[in-house]
From Swiss-Prot:
GO terms for molecular function: structural constituent of ribosome. Residues 8-19 have a biased composition (Basic residues). InterPro entries: Ribosomal_eS1 (IPR001593), Ribosomal_eS1_euk (IPR027500). HAMAP family: Ribosomal_eS1_euk. Belongs to the eukaryotic ribosomal protein eS1 family. Residues 1-23, 235-259 are annotated as: Disordered. This is Small ribosomal subunit protein eS1. Keywords: Cytoplasm, Ribonucleoprotein, Ribosomal protein. SMART domains: Ribosomal_S3Ae. It is found in: Cytoplasm. The keyword Ribosomal protein applies.
């Protein structure tokens, strides 16, 4: 007695056979990312995007993309690798993506290495508007230094002094940023001069140790302007003024018989 039914024999194996897998990178192309003129290294990275197909345009897909690069990649200085700059693509010209400043942040390992026990950690944040219409939020962090040759293990600051230090830090950031445009602000963020000026101004309240601008966020930006972006990249086209020609009223150009 048969236990199972006889299997149907098909010719040529499974239906359809094995499908060929296409290489996903065959439909993509590379674009160079150009940093603003404030950074020493302009062409700093490359990015992939799907090629233009139908109504999907590659340049439009790139606009708004945010890339994160360390200051070491933007300036070729290995001691600045713990500071990350965020750049946003605002325009595409050929195979070059023109970017604008989008934020700043310290790496996680650097932030953990500067936090030490038995010392006061003082943090503050403030929203400042630049002269060209950018609303930025600054986060600053500082610490009280360890006292050498002291019987006490800790060097905590009093709460009243911490409040005064925090207010002084906020005041210095507002003074440094509110009178500058975005280009000048980025030029101050690259050497971290804002944090050092704030530390010097607040040290008379209580001695301070390492001070950093921990994070910068762009909360609001003005309407996109290609001329401003080209000026930020140092590629603004200067048009030479033309010479004015005086002509009488009701002037008509002469007729040309042949062209």
């Amino acid at each position: 007695m048969a236990v199972g039914g006889q299997k149907k024999v098909t010719k040529g194996g499974k239906k359809g056979g094995k499908k060929k897998t296409a290489d996903p990178f065959s439909k993509k192309e590379w674009y160079d990312i150009k940093a603003p003129a404030m950074f020493p290294k302009r062409t700093c990275a490359r990015t992939l995007v799907t090629r233009t197909q139908g109504t999907r345009i590659a340049s439009e897909a790139l606009k708004g993309r945010v890339v994160t690069l360390s200051l070491g990649d933007l300036s070729e200085k290995n001691e600045e690798v713990f500071r990350k700059f965020k750049l946003q693509i605002e325009d595409v010209q050929g195979r070059h993506c023109l970017t604008n400043f989008h934020g700043l942040e310290l790496t996680r390992d650097k932030l953990c290495s500067v936090v030490v026990k038995w010392r006061s950690t003082i943090e503050a944040h403030v929203d400042v508007k630049t002269t060209d219409g950018y609303l930025l939020r600054f986060f600053i962090i500082t610490f009280t230094p360890s006292v050498p040759r002291s019987e006490r293990l800790h060097s905590y600051a009093q709460t009243t002094r911490i409040k005064r230090i925090r207010a002084r830090l906020v005041e210095i950031i507002q003074q440094e940023v509110s009178t500058c445009d975005l280009k000048e602000v980025v030029n101050k963020l690259i050497p971290d001069s804002i944090a050092q000026d704030a530390r010097k101004a607040a040290s008379w309240i209580y001695p301070l140790g390492e001070t950093f601008i921990r994070k910068v966020k762009v909360l609001k930006r003005p309407k996109a302007d290609l001329a401003r972006l080209m000026e930020l990249h140092g590629e603004s086209k200067s048009t030479a003024p033309g010479e004015t020609v005086s002509r009488p009223d009701h002037y008509e150009p002469p007729k040309v018989d042949s062209v």
